[in-house]
Amino acid sequence: MRILYGIQGTGNGHLSRGEFIYQLLLKKSTQIDVLLSGDNYSLTPSMPIKYRNKGVTFVINNGKIDYLKTLGNLDLFTSYVEQKNIPFKEYDFIITDFEPITAWASLRYKIPSIHISHQASFIESKVPRPESRNILGEYIMKYFCPTNDYIGLHYKSYGPSISEPIISSDILDFNSKVRGHVSVYLPWYDDDYLYDFF
């Protein structure tokens, strides 16, 4: 089975999860090609990246999508040209981690597909949301990456298609001593913004 795995390049979470899933996929298939869409990450991928696409990368400002800057950053022509060089029809299965190019290609070419990401969990109505709902955000979560099926990743299961987060065994097996200190990773927030909370 030939698999195309699309990974969103907005942040490190998609990429680190992608590394873990890629290793699991190698146990089932040796024909896995990775498409990395966008370039807003700081990790260096260890898996081979066959396709790179400018893609649709969200601009984040203080933990929220900046829709105007995201629109200004779009280069749909370049993204379209890059997609023309990807032989989607040669794949038997498509997996996407909130990556729209592979998701939409799976529908266009009728290739079985699955969306695995935290964002996919918001397809389920039982997943908690803020009191003031962001209608555009809800729409993006539901329709940005349409696939045949999905597995949402959340802190607990709110439905049959939601699993707990994927965490590498290196982290799970790490023997740490808290000693009254907890570090929180919030890369999308400016330090000045966070000082008000801490």
What does each of the following model-derived ranges do?
Residues 124-192:
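A nucleotide-sugar donor-handling region in carbohydrate enzymes
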Residues 5-9, 30-78:
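Conserved nucleotide-sugar phosphate-binding/catalytic loop shared by glycosyltransferases and other
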